[in-house]
Amino acid sequence: MNIHEFQAKELLRDFGINVADGIMVVSVDDALNAAKKLGGSVWAVKAQIHAGGRGLGGGVKIAKSLDEVKEYASKILGMTLVTKQTGPEGKLVKKLYIEKGTNIDKEYYLSLTFDRINECIAVIASADGGMNIEEVDHDKIITIRIDPQIGLRDFHSLAIADFLNLDKDLSVKLHVLLSKLYRLYWQTDSNLVEINPLVLTKENDLIPLDAKMGFDDSALFRQEKIANMRDIDEEEPSELEAKTYGLSYVKLDGNIGCMVNGAGLAMGTMDTINGVGGKPANFLDVGGGANPQTVAKAFEIILRDKNVKSIFVNIFGGIVRCDRIANGILEATKLTKVEVPVIVRLDGTNAKEAAEILKQANITNIISAPDLESGAKMSVELANK
């Protein structure tokens, strides 16, 4: 689960981290009143969406007068903001964050995330802040891996401070900040805490100017405050609906629908489709409790995406019996108008029975595939016809 910048900064404050004063607003009048309340002569007017790259997309403006606050708020509120992370469809801006201006001397990048390969916490830092970290040269980035059983230590912070060429005073301030961020990361079940930029002010303080946080959905049951920060408007409606049926669905931008059981097989199926020149339209794991009704619902959700030109069903029957999937496919054809080709590869428990069920149904656009690669190739070929 992701949250907005204004919510992330609320959490930063909860953990004793100094951030600039700001107020979330939903109207132009509120934006103007917020700027007056904050005081000063410079304000940042920031679109609040769950995506990075807002500045480049025109979603962050620096106002040097109340008239400019009003002007920028009018332009940004209600706009469809397109960034590298939103995709071409963009996101509608419904909220703004009005933040008091900061005297910036230098910008850095700092983040904490989970390193799955090394099974540790990775602290990533760079002296090139304020831009996408993916675009920064590798030799300008330092990654410090922290053993969770040991935790953050002075030498971790010193290594980062040395890499960033900070003086003694700032090195101490960085360690204090990192210690608080590390505690925030652990105690909120985060999977990402990204500060970009972390700014050095002209007053010689280190201040998070922007903050992005993501959380482990499976831990939200013990994070009531964070769970209440969920903004349904920022999430894909089909993904939310899928969850209510026990389906794990993520919309992508390809044209080949995927229905698979098991996250690992789903990833392998998507890789195979990519490998034979196709592009998946979604990730969909029907899970271990799939029945004909949930399979039919999965078809319905996949087919809402008008970009889908074929569907590849790849099931290895274990907990999920293949005959259940076959009956679900037939149920879907009754409940939903399935006009695109459906390529079906079934293996494992009751695979023979499933093949017979589909054969007896004699539906022309349901095509059996003998193996994964053949099914992927057929899906790509039929999608491109």
UniProtKB/Swiss-Prot annotation:
- EC number from the UniProt entry: 6.2.1.5
**Cofactor: bound how, per the entry note?**
Binds 1 Mg(2+) ion per subunit.
Where does this protein hold Mg(2+)? N196, D210
| Pathway(s) served | Carbohydrate metabolism; tricarboxylic acid cycle; succinate from succinyl-CoA (ligase route): step 1/1
Q: Which residues form the ATP-grasp domain?
A: 9-241
Q: What does this protein do?
A: Succinyl-CoA synthetase functions in the citric acid cycle (TCA), coupling the hydrolysis of succinyl-CoA to the synthesis of either ATP or GTP and thus represents the only step of substrate-level phosphorylation in the TCA. The beta subunit provides nucleotide specificity of the enzyme and binds the substrate succinate, while the binding sites for coenzyme A and phosphate are found in the alpha subunit.
Per UniProt, subunit arrangement is: Heterotetramer of two alpha and two beta subunits.
Residues holding ATP: K46, G53, R54, G55, E99, T102, E107
Residues engaged in binding substrate:
N261, G318, I319, V320
PANTHER family reported in the protein's UniProt record: SUCCINATE--COA LIGASE [GDP-FORMING] SUBUNIT BETA, MITOCHONDRIAL, SUCCINYL-COA SYNTHETASE BETA CHAIN
User: GO terms for biological process?
Assistant: succinyl-CoA metabolic process; tricarboxylic acid cycle
Needed cofactors: Mg(2+)
Protein name from the UniProt record: Succinate--CoA ligase [ADP-forming] subunit beta
Q: Which family does it belong to?
A: Belongs to the succinate/malate CoA ligase beta subunit family.
Q: Which GO terms describe its molecular function?
A: ATP binding; magnesium ion binding; succinate-CoA ligase (ADP-forming) activity; succinate-CoA ligase (GDP-forming) activity
Keyword annotations from UniProtKB, A to Z: ATP-binding, Ligase, Magnesium, Metal-binding, Nucleotide-binding, Tricarboxylic acid cycle
